[in-house]
Amino acid sequence: MRVIFTCGGTAGHVNPALALAGLMRQRDPQTAVLFVGTPDGMERELVAKAGYDYAAVEVDSFRRSMRPEAMRHNLHAAGALARSGPAAKAILREFRPDLVVGTGGYASFPMVKAAARAHIPTAVHESNSVPGLTTRMLEEYADVIMVGFEDCRQHYRHPERIMVTGTPVRGDFFEKTPLEARQNLAFDDGRPVVVSFWGSLGASHMNEAMLDMFEKERENGFPFHHVHAVGKSGWETMETALRQRELALCPDLDVRQYIYNMATVMRAADLVICRAGASTISELTALGMPAIMVPSPYVTNNHQEKNARILE
């Protein structure tokens, strides 16, 4: 079987696709897999680390604003979207997939649309409790719409196409025991482990709050190990702040731009402090992990708070 997974924008769109690809390869090692995303999105890096082939289609998001800079950006995005159709068709001709699966993010739109028009079976997965703009637009093209939450079903016009599947979690989350994960990270002194992150892109205000938390941890003699992911957008600012506050060399504080070995780090944790993206929630619930969630207020339709409240 030959399968294209198309996704992008944030790790929350990429990780479910990686989980599905891993499961398909496990069931049939001969499955040919191609990921399609944007040329410079973080999906390219995550897919490469997972060992899959990758192709790029130039496409960009649309900004919901009438400000001049947003309108200029949207003009560029409209041009990229128009060019993405022929590029998607070329990838389909070359790879000849039996199935195209979109897992969200604007990068998935041209591939799923082109596949549907070429009469190639298509599926879309929406992890969040409220569908994003891309998956709403793809409803007319997808043969099957998989959703992570039952609550999401009501937002679609074609209930006969909906399958409530949950959000898949990568198999490597279950490969180690908590003890093995801690030993892998050299956290073997019996102290608890706290893991915190604000999504793959980061959150400047929350990272500032974490700096104050780090200082309080130091004042109390670091009663636990702390692994924190800053995110792509705030890394340089955080590096400078850590040096200024003399926190950069603290052995019990592991601050990174991104947690690439999330399966090991989360498995080692006693507590996770995080946003409420659907993929993260699925990983936490699969592991039975205690968590403090701070939903992002800047997402479409406030879907992160709705994701988190489903767990109440």
Regions found by a protein language model. Name each.
Residues 52, 120-121, 270-271, 288-296:
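Structural loop-to-beta junction motif characteristic of Rossmann-like glycosyltransferase folds
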Residues 87-100, 107-123, 136, 140:
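Glycosyltransferases and closely related glycan-assembly transferases
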Residues 281, 286-312:
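Catalytic binding pocket for nucleotide-activated donors in carbohydrate/polymer assembly enzymes
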Residues 97-99, 259, 263, 267-281, ...:
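Acidic donor-binding loop of glycosyltransferase active sites
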Residues 3-10, 30-83, 232-234:
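Conserved nucleotide-sugar phosphate-binding/catalytic loop shared by glycosyltransferases and other
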Residues 34, 42, 53, 116-179:
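Active-site-proximal region of nucleotide-activated glycan assembly enzymes
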